[in-house]
Amino acid sequence: MLFRSVYFLEKNFTFKNFLQSQDFVNNVGKISEEEGHHPDISFGWGYAKVTITTHAIEGLSENDFILAAKIDKIS
């Protein structure tokens, strides 16, 4: 069964090309591993979309906002 919380943080990021998008996603992955909290990410040529939620509580937690702030810092 697939589940998606009604409560989530989501942001679209734009870049000049695919490699910049890929580098951003790789950096998000590193931050996520450090935090132990992992977003859903989709990306392609010139864009990345990051969606953050806490599945265990079916909503938002403090960790979501911390991760979002750290991702914003590298964008």
Predicted feature descriptions by range:
Residues 8-16:
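Short, well-ordered beta-strand elements within core beta-sheets of diverse protein domains
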Residues 27-39:
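Short arginine-rich
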Residues 49-74:
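C-terminal structural segments of small proteins and small subunits
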Residues 1-2:
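Short, small-residue-biased leader/transition segments that mark boundaries at the very start
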Residues 25-28, 68:
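Short amphipathic alpha-helical/adjacent loop interface patches that line ligand
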Residues 17-26:
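Short amphipathic alpha-helices within nucleic acid-binding modules
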Residues 6, 43-47:
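Short Gly/Ser/Thr- and Asp/Glu-enriched loop/turn motifs at secondary-structure junctions
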